[in-house]
Amino acid sequence: MNRLDQLISTFDLGLRTVFATPHAGRPYPGSPQEAELSETERAHAAALMRVNHVGEVCAQALYAGQALTAKNAQVRSELERAAREETDHLAWCEQRIDELGGRKSLLNPLWFGGAFGIGVVAGLLGDKWNLGFLAETERQVEAHLDGHLQKLPEADAKSRAVVEQMKLDEAQHAQIAIAHGGASLPPPVKWAMRFAADVMRQTASRI
């Protein structure tokens, strides 16, 4: 696939990620039985799942940008494999938001565009930094999901099942990236990533 075809494919991915209904390749983790949740609990859970959905929108864009500029075919293949699992996460989060009567972030086009740009830059820095960025991203997402497991209503088993499976997948992505030669990022870069993620989470929980 030449560079123009890749750009067209990325544009198509952006449209599908932001505006279409994604389809998971794996079964939905949540139990078919819905728990009895108060309106306040449902709204709270929906806001948390909206933040998680934004994270998956960003993951689609980030991996697309990284794959576009990756120099090694094996690295590109690994990024594309991770992106396929993130599509499952995207679909699960959207389904759970719908079940809770919530809505997706209104800023999803902005999130996608920003994350794609970051992914392109990460790829241009070279494969060891590209994979290192992937590993650090997944570590931070894993920690974020662990925090959401503490915040979700105790009775909301369906949301918890989704988040727990996502957490397992993110940890595996980080391990694979390191095994393929991902470098540890400098502390200032890790801090900047956490700061940007905090801004995204605070904004997405409301808008």
Curated annotation (Swiss-Prot):
Fe cation 1 binds at E56, E86, H89, E170. Pathway: Cofactor biosynthesis; ubiquinone biosynthesis. It comes from the Bacteria. GO terms for molecular function: 3-demethoxyubiquinol 3-hydroxylase activity; metal ion binding. Binds 2 iron ions per subunit. Catalyzes the hydroxylation of 2-nonaprenyl-3-methyl-6-methoxy-1,4-benzoquinol during ubiquinone biosynthesis. Its cofactor is Fe cation. GO terms for cellular component: plasma membrane. It catalyses: a 5-methoxy-2-methyl-3-(all-trans-polyprenyl)benzene-1,4-diol + AH2 + O2 = a 3-demethylubiquinol + A + H2O. It is found in: Cell membrane. Pfam families: COQ7 (PF03232). Its EC number is 1.14.99.60. Belongs to the COQ7 family. It is an enzyme of class 1 (oxidoreductase). This is 3-demethoxyubiquinol 3-hydroxylase. Fe cation 2 binds at E86, E138, E170, H173. It is a peripheral membrane protein. The gene is coq7. GO terms for biological process: ubiquinone biosynthetic process. Keywords: Cell membrane, Iron, Membrane, Metal-binding, Monooxygenase, Oxidoreductase, Ubiquinone biosynthesis.
